[in-house]
């Protein structure tokens, strides 16, 4: 069964690595200029799409952030007796725009981050008067929303990778946002927010070619740009939609006590201490795939600006979504989500039935629990294992090989840091298992280069002295007759029809693709050993059960969420192998009362032993304990026949009751 757990773990790591191997995209998120996000290369190698579990993990992470933000609100505002500047107590503030305040909306578009040219008619994009703060019934659709669409004439600087900003002003009715108009401008009657509306993405170019012909299918223009700008080019991208939300909130916030990340949106007036209405630029539902690059060929850009009121609760959700991951302290390039991962979560939320989505989230939590239990039982099984009878040692070594190939592949493709760490931990666990299946020691007599001690590996006696080693060697010999021809065919196909960065990348890509396609075959040697031993009692059934349940959950996700056909086939073939294990468990049932070929049974060692009555000199019968047999756990019981009990010798002088007849031998399976 070691082969099953190793191959199953490698399959999960391989799919996870494939989902994040190319250049990725990260969102702007915060107000103002953000770090450039990364876009996918124009000629990426063929990679599997992110699996269902990656999509669900993204949803669960967002739910956790939402819960954390909500917990701050349940704590309530800070007490008013907190000391402020000069020792005076801090008091709760109020919204400078009371509910039902009449206000005007002014939207300006400019290439300058700080806007001052209010007299330029070309900069004014939209002006909407007589809006009511907190009105949810006006507008064309009676939802309080308004929108405006227009084509923007973009200047040459924006065409040449420059920035463009949106400046939004809300003023109370009768006032103007221009500070130079003294009669119409009031500081406490004007709220302003701006943001860069284009997004910078890194476009990575990987110089790949056919290693035999030297030809490439990459766009010649892209090759020229890569020669001019290098392998990574930062390009401005555009999305035609953005929503301006004003939060309908009158919470008595206390300055200095607003929990993050909400504190970056609540702006207090320095003189009055009250806070301005909260303006939020909402682009959460803008899918990454809908962004397109801005270049010299575009003379204008379409822009649709929507205005909608936003409740406090929904604003908390969006603010939580825009919160950067806690892993970002490692750097934006180390932890990032791909375009597919970001869009798949949003599409799932938009298109999936709410009941089905709720069921999927619940099952995802169960999947996480099973994943943890499988990991825990796997470690416990190998840590407490004393005998290797019935276990495939070669499968453990093949699992180490699989893990190393996956690790080298994701390092070569510059996958994000979190995936690299998780795969590296998996490699360490696989290496630790080697110490449990072999005797590993440092040979200080035969040193490497005369300096470093040499590692010595030796098979354990419980493996050598049993028939398991013979069956293990036989299984892998038969397996090699299938794997090596398949590996050769796949290597030729990869060399003839796919492009690679170099020979090293070709070797890793070829091995990675081969393991992804045919790795499930390595689960079969354990089936062969079980067949030869006519027993499955040596297998870690708890760990196997958790992994089987997780595989069935993966099947559910694969058919509920849009997934590649090859991934669905991969889940199905793993199910077939697990069903074979279940069939073997059914036909090779374990009888806990039998003693196996190792002299062990599955009886409870604490159970009382049967007693025989022996007559004393006075003729009375006294109980005498019968000899006990060595016991073992139920999982280590075998299907061998029990040994016959020996009869005690009769005394010549005193009569002894005849011993009970031995039970009939049970029928072999």
UniProtKB/Swiss-Prot annotation:
**What subcellular locations does the record give?**
Membrane
Q: How does this chain sit within the bilayer?
A: Multi-pass membrane protein
Of the GO CC terms on this record, one is: external side of plasma membrane
Carrying Phosphoserine, the residues are 601
Cytoplasmic side stretches: 376-390, 438-477, 524-669
Which residues are glycosylated according to the annotation? 28, 119, 161, 241, 295, 413
Where in the body, by tissue, does this protein show up?
Widely expressed.
Predominant cellular place of this UniProt entry's protein = membrane
- An example molecular function term from Gene Ontology annotations: GABA receptor binding
Q: A GO BP term, please?
A: regulation of T cell differentiation in thymus
**Spans traversing the lipid bilayer:** 355-375, 391-411, 417-437, 478-498, 503-523
Stretches for region Disordered: 1-50, 614-669
Top-level taxonomic group: Eukaryota
Looking up Pfam families in the UniProt record yields: CLPTM1
The UniProt regions of compositional bias labelled Polar residues, in chain numbering, are 638-648
The N-acetylalanine modification is found at 2
Give the record's keywords alphabetically: Acetylation, Chromosomal rearrangement, Developmental protein, Differentiation, Glycoprotein, Membrane, Phosphoprotein, Transmembrane, Transmembrane helix
The residue ranges flagged as biased composition, category Low complexity, are 614-632
The family annotation for this protein states: Belongs to the CLPTM1 family.
Q: What does this protein do?
A: Involved in GABAergic but not glutamatergic transmission. Binds and traps GABAA receptors in the endoplasmic reticulum (ER). Modulates postsynaptic GABAergic transmission, and therefore inhibitory neurotransmission, by reducing the plasma membrane expression of these receptors. Altered GABAergic signaling is one among many causes of cleft palate. Might function as a lipid scramblase, translocating lipids in membranes from one leaflet to the other one.
Name-wise, this protein is Putative lipid scramblase CLPTM1
Q: Give the source species.
A: Homo sapiens (Human)
